[in-house]
Amino acid sequence: MNDVRVPTVHDLRVTLLDVSPPVWRRLRVPSTVTLSALHGILQVAFGWRDCHLHEWRTGERTLGPPEEESWGDELEDESAAVLGEVAGADCVLHYDYDFGDGWEHIVEVLAVTPYDASQPPLAVLDGARAVPPEDSGGPIGYEHLLDALADEDDPEHDDMLEWVGDAFDPEEFDRAEVNRRLESLWRWH
């Protein structure tokens, strides 16, 4: 693939707030992506299913999809906002996903560096833990879910286990699988 259009990359650390132990990802992302594309990248990196509304906040700006209604602020079109123009080194963005559950992410720009053609321009470099299941009730609901799953005597244990499935492991994070999905996403970018 020819990545001449990628002059620099952003080194990001993205942390899901109010969840303990922390769920986080460290990514290398082309500085040329829009916030709309970064939304898709974060959905893949965290394992969200893109079933809910989202928005970005930085300074006085609130950005999101043009057809989306914000919660009080006028939204700028995220598809016109390029990461490299919105967020430089040491900048912090706020990424909110699923306003009902209230999943808040902090996106820290750790560095902006020249693109090294020997590395993929888009990759998850590290991370920890599985993302909470969609519609699990936000941080408080997720904590309740984890407590019920951990205690076989909890009256909701069986219902919660049936809901999330036997394969759900809150400690699991498969970096190689996420990178396969990101590579596929980047090919179609």
Where on the chain are the PLM-derived regions?
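Short linear regulatory motifs enriched in tryptophan with gly/pro/ser
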Residues: 1-189
